[in-house]
């Protein structure tokens, strides 16, 4: 049983998550998110904590952002686009139970105070920008860290906002390098 309440977009997502874990859930109804639902999420955050698990697409990130701005201290769980895609449809409802469990286990909380641990130079060094493989590497490393895929600037911001340490990034990059590129740092 997961202690936190899991916030998802819709009923199909609830079904998929229930196949993976035993947890209380709140469905926001996509962009139908309103003050009543936000109040429910705030109450859940006070009582047990909240993990937001939205679709790995623009709409999912927008919903995640709306919730994050209104409810402080929530955790973010993410599945990759490849894990959430089936027959051209992207969503949590398409993810395997294993992918959902991995995402929930890797859920990260945004830090209240932004750190400046990482710079663009780190992104270049780890080939996360300025490289023909950068987009793929950000997807793989982001998945490994549990912060999801994003463009270079947003990825740098997530590294700093989620309190990722240099050691965590190095371990994730090494895992990706060994798994997909047959090399290490």
Swiss-Prot record:
Stored InterPro entries: RNase_M5, RNase_M5_C, TOPRIM_dom, TOPRIM_RNase_M5-like
Cofactor(s) required, per the database record: Mg(2+)
Pfam families documented for this protein: DUF4093 (PF13331), Toprim (PF01751)
GO terms, molecular function: metal ion binding; ribonuclease M5 activity; rRNA binding
Enzyme class label: hydrolase
PROSITE patterns: TOPRIM
UniProt domain Toprim: residue ranges: 3-84
PANTHER family, alphabetized: RIBONUCLEASE M5 (PTHR39156:SF1)
Protein name, entry field: Ribonuclease M5
Origin species: Clostridium acetobutylicum (strain ATCC 824 / DSM 792 / JCM 1419 / IAM 19013 / LMG 5710 / NBRC 13948 / NRRL B-527 / VKM B-1787 / 2291 / W)
């Amino acid at each position: 049983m997961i202690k936190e309440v899991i916030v998802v977009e819709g009923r199909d997502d609830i079904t998929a998550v229930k196949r993976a874990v035993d947890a209380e859930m709140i469905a926001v109804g996509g962009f139908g998110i309103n003050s009543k639902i936000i109040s429910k999420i705030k109450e859940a955050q006070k009582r047990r904590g909240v993990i937001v698990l939205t679709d790995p697409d623009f709409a999912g990130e927008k919903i995640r952002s709306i919730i994050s701005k209104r409810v402080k201290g929530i955790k973010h769980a993410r599945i990759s686009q490849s894990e959430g895609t089936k027959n051209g449809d992207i969503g949590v409802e398409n993810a395997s139970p294993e992918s959902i469990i991995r995402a929930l286990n890797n859920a990260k909380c945004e830090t209240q105070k932004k750190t400046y641990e990482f710079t663009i130079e780190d992104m270049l060094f780890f080939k996360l920008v300025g490289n023909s493989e950068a987009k793929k590497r950000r997807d793989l490393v982001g998945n490994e860290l549990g912060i999801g895929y994003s463009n270079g600037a947003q990825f740098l911001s997530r590294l700093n906002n989620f309190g990722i340490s240099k050691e965590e990034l190095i371990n994730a990059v090494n895992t990706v390098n060994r798994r997909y590129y047959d090399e290490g740092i």
